Curated annotation (Swiss-Prot):
Binds two Mg(2+) per subunit. The active form of the enzyme binds two Mg(2+) ions in its active site. The first Mg(2+) forms only one salt bridge with the protein. Residues 20-195 form the Exonuclease domain. The gene is rnt. NCBIfam families: RNaseT. Mg(2+) 1 binds at residue 23. The active site is at 182 (proton donor/acceptor). GO terms for biological process: DNA replication proofreading; tRNA processing. It comes from Vibrio cholerae serotype O1 (strain ATCC 39315 / El Tor Inaba N16961). One of its GO terms (cellular component) is cytosol. Transmembrane segments: none annotated. This is Ribonuclease T. Belongs to the RNase T family.
C-alpha cells in the first residue's frame, strides 16, 4: 500500500507527471502556419495537506515568426492589433520557450517528477502551438509529454457542467473579469486556479488518496 503522506505529493498525485498550466494567444487556428503571439505558463505545487496551488508564473509577448500568417479576425479577437509594435516588448519564440522550459525543468526536478505535462483549457490547441513552435526553434529537449494533456474544459464539464472558461470559473465560485479575458497571462492564472479547485474538491470529496492504491498501479516510469 502507498503511504498516505507519500500519496499527498505532486509526484504521486499525477503518476510522476509535473503539471504546468499553459495558455497561448495566436493569430489563427493553424499551429503550423499562424503566429504565436503570447504565451504564459504557471507551475503548480502541493502543500503538506495534499492541496494544489499555483506556484510560479512566467509570461511573454512573442514576435511572429518569419512568414507567419496573421488572421485579421484572430487579431481582433485577442486585441493584438499590431503584432509588430515595439510597445508589446515581444521576444522571439526561441527566447520565450527556452526561458519557460528552464523554469519547468527546475521545478519539475525539485518535485521529483519524471516529466512535465501541459494543463490547458481546450488543451489540444495550446499543446499544438507549443509543439509547433518548439519544432520551428529546433528545441530537442521539450519537457512536455508529446501528446498527453490535462484539459480543464473536459474536467470542468464533468465537475461543474460548464466548458467555457468564464462560466466554469464562476460556477466554481471564482471571480472572472471578462474584460481581462484573452490575455494569456490572465487566462493562464484563471485556468490554474480552476484546475487546482477541481483537484482539491475531488480530494475533499474523498476521491484521493485511493483506498486500494498499490505500487503495481503507480509505476512512475511508465509515462505513456
Amino acid at each position: 500500500m502507498t503511504d498516505k503522506n507519500d500519496a499527498l505529493t505532486l509526484k504521486k498525485r499525477f503518476r510522476g507527471y509535473f503539471p504546468v498550466v499553459i495558455d497561448v494567444e495566436t493569430a489563427g487556428f493553424n499551429a503550423q502556419t499562424d503566429a504565436l503571439l503570447e504565451i504564459c505558463a504557471v507551475t503548480l505545487s502541493m502543500d503538506e495537506n495534499g492541496d494544489l496551488h499555483p506556484a510560479s508564473t512566467i509570461h511573454f509577448h512573442v514576435e511572429p515568426f518569419e512568414g507567419a500568417n496573421l488572421e485579421k479576425a484572430a487579431l481582433e479577437f485577442t486585441g493584438i492589433y499590431d503584432p509588430f509594435s515595439p510597445l508589446r516588448g515581444a521576444v522571439s519564440e526561441d527566447h520565450a520557450l527556452k526561458e519557460i522550459y528552464k523554469l519547468v525543468r527546475k521545478e519539475q526536478k525539485a518535485a521529483d517528477c519524471s516529466r512535465a505535462i501541459i494543463v490547458a483549457h481546450n488543451a489540444h490547441f495550446d499543446h499544438s502551438f507549443v509543439m509547433a513552435a518548439s519544432e520551428r526553434c529546433k528545441l530537442k529537449r521539450v519537457p512536455f509529454h508529446p501528446f498527453a494533456t490535462f484539459d480543464t474544459a473536459t474536467l470542468s464539464g464533468l465537475a461543474f457542467g460548464q466548458t467555457v472558461l468564464a462560466k466554469a470559473c464562476k460556477t466554481a465560485g471564482m471571480e472572472f473579469d471578462n474584460r481581462e479575458a484573452h490575455s494569456a497571462l490572465y487566462d493562464t492564472q484563471k485556468t490554474a486556479e480552476l484546475f487546482c479547485t477541481i483537484v482539491n474538491q475531488w480530494k475533499a470529496l474523498g476521491g484521493w488518496p485511493l483506498v486500494n492504491d498499490d505500487e503495481d498501479n503507480n509505476n512512475d516510469a511508465d509515462l505513456d
